[in-house]
Each structure stands twice: as C-alpha cells, then as structure tokens.
Amino acid sequence: MNFVVIGKDKGDGALRRQERPAHLEYVADRQGLILYAGPLIERGRMIGSIFIFDVPDRAALDAYLADDPYFTRPIFETIEIYESRCMVPESEPGFLVAEAERSRAAT
C-alpha cells in the first residue's frame, strides 16, 4: 500500500537541524519502504517534508513513524497521512489506458 505523509514544520527549524543526522541514518537503513521523500519548499524556504511510502499496511507505516526521529520529536506542527495509489509511472503497461476506459464506462 502507498501512503503519503506530509509534515509541516514547527518553529524556526532548529529542532529539525538537530535531529536531521539521526533521521537520515534511520531513513538510509529503510530505503526500500520509501518511494520518494524530500522537503516542502515555499518561496525558497523549507516548510516541511513529504514522504511517499510503499508498505504492507497502515500498521507498518505506524511502526516506521514510531521510530523515525522526525516523528518521535516535535519537529512538525501538523502531520497529514493519506492512503494513495501510484498511477504514474504505470505499475504495469497499459494501466492508464485501462483506467481511462473504466472511468468512461462508469459515467
């Protein structure tokens, strides 16, 4: 299952900078679970982070977040979690065309 996790920063980023080495080491040991991750940037300033996870279920995501220093410390003012599905790149050839046909048939 894919999950999108969006964390919006709290404060001036001092705690983020302090926890960043431990967070990066944690992520480096678990790269297979993250499809994409990086900073959210607004007007040239980092305002948070986005993570796209590929995990077996919500319990696996919760277990990951329970040990990641960015989520165990008060780095984020808000955290949003959404289940998602990868459409691009296609999970299998022809998926997008088949999905378009299903959508047309449903209307």
Locate each region found by the language model:
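Conserved, structured core segments of small domains
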Residues: 1-107
